[in-house]
Swiss-Prot record:
The gene is pink-1. InterPro entries: Kinase-like_dom_sf, MitoQC_Scaffold_Kinases, PINK1_STKc, Prot_kinase_dom. It is found in: Mitochondrion. It catalyses: L-seryl-[protein] + ATP = O-phospho-L-seryl-[protein] + ADP + H(+); L-threonyl-[protein] + ATP = O-phospho-L-threonyl-[protein] + ADP + H(+). Residues 1-74 form a transit peptide. ATP binds at L143, G144, Q145, G146, C147, N148, A149, A150, V151, K199. One of its GO terms (biological process) is mitophagy. Autophosphorylated. It is an enzyme of class 2 (transferase). Belongs to the protein kinase superfamily. Ser/Thr protein kinase family. Its cofactor is Mg(2+). Protects against mitochondrial dysfunction during cellular stress, potentially by phosphorylating mitochondrial proteins. Plays a role in mitophagy. This is Serine/threonine-protein kinase pink-1, mitochondrial.
Amino acid sequence: MSMKRFGKAAYRIANELVAKGGRLPIFQRFLPRIFPATYNLGVHVVLKKAPFPRQNALRIARLVTRHGRVFRPFSSVIIERHRFQNQNDWRRKFQPIRKELPRNVDLVERIRQIFGNSLRYNEDLKSTEWPNRIDSYEFGEFLGQGCNAAVYSARLANSDAESSGNTHYGAGFNEVTNILAEIPPVSKVAQKKFPLAIKLMFNFEHDRDGDAHLLKSMGNELAPYPNAAKLLNGQMGTFRPLPAKHPNVVRIQTAFIDSLKVLPDAIERYPDALHTARWYESIASEPKTMYVVMRRYRQTLHEYVWTRHRNYWTGRVIIAQLLEACTYLHKHKVAQRDMKSDNILLEYDFDDEIPQLVVADFGCALACDNWQVDYESDEVSLGGNAKTKAPEIATAVPGKNVKVNFEMADTWAAGGLSYEVLTRSNPFYKLLDTATYQESELPALPSRVNFVARDVIFDLLKRDPNERVKPNIAANALNLSLFRMGEDVKQMMEKCGISQMTTLLAGSSKVLSQKINSRLDKVMNLITAETIMANLAPHLISRAERQLRATFLSRMNREDIWRSLQYFFPAGVQLDTPATSSDCLETISSLMSSFSNDSENYEKQQKPAKNGYNNVPLLLRNVIRTDADGINGIVHRVRSK
């Protein structure tokens, strides 16, 4: 048989396959499984939908003109490859046989990442766009007035009371599930009809056009607003606002300059701040001012301490939040300079709930990345109230080359506010003069105040700013005193052997044995675990306290923790026989057994270092103190034995 006959036979067979391929059972059975994309395009689209005339030439021409698949014979291969690569689970197909190298990540760094970068524990990570025109807001009742602004409640325009009250401002501890917590039923307060507060800044220069003078005179109010730099556009030179939001700094949603809105009570309350004031000979074509839109808070600290029963545990949480705010401001070289109880705002839903605290009113703030202020004449403003100025500020005398340092001014003011929280009276309002008082003249705190809080407050009010405790160290000490751990936190630390590891040297953790630091990591693991588990039991630990713990854990470091532990175990008499590292390790290991039934075999094979004494600095015996009247401030026990 010649090759010509073979060619004719193959040609006829091919024609029959093309003509009847769409109806062949074998194609219908295997093509969808092997090449689903090819089958859908080639069989369903081409063979079924296209009419097939008998003329082969016309049939081929129609296929070419309609689909062009003759010019792309391998297009199905590309389609299959694209489908395979887009599968979400293909990377996990060989996961059991993959071996990842262990990452050497420091435990403290991991804890900071968990509580600093997770939306669950840090609602400030969530951002919301807010309108920048005053017509987009509806004003409510008058809330208060100062020398430079009036504050009104507000909500977004064209929104009813229900939608405004349920406006969502961020995730976090407010979204804790109640299923596992088994929270007892409580009466909920009515939703706020006006959840915002708008600060209407007073413009006393309506005869000037433009926005530059408004930004220069009112820009300090934007210190806690992360987007302030974009609004100011370099008008304030060295002004450096806070780079991010913080749970204990007032939440500014947005700020903008717009036309002056004359409210019904404006003429009665602040006539001099209106463009209708009698001394203006001419005014700008469009009177403007700055508006600062903030979250609305329930009460000031001054109102709270006089309307609520004193609770020393609640007071300690409030003071710790205040110190967290001071720590954040100190870190970014921002001084609020007017730290008084009227400028501390609180938010809570129920009367017996521990409030969340924020520092507000930054109109007198110093935010130029420098603590020093040239004080050459009395015309230079040092900000704030005379009764709440730190001693180094109150005693400053103007002169040539005189500089005033505000680094520790807010920290000192926090000490006076701590007195007000615990006793309802700030000693510097009437009893003492900030410029002349002596530390021995400070009034005694109630005996039921926790000993750590008592010592921290006295150290905050040191006259010499160089001897004053840093805000982060003070905040650490109070935060550690608030951890429950199923017992008094001091007893827990004694079991851990921490009392034998504190030294007189600040920052001694750098030279501590690696093994001892690893045991400190175990303790921090327990504290972190308790904080995470508290998320499942919100009826035991308040929302404010959970947020406080997350803030503390998101910024902690070992060096500051060791320095803070001196408030629990102050340095005392030197050891006659210095403890070895093995003694510390055994003591620390004993702590683990008190929290886990499975820890009996924990590091039984751990061998002490041969040069253990050389790896540990000189250890000092510590004086163990207890609270007066035996009160440790524990309210609830997370774990009962």
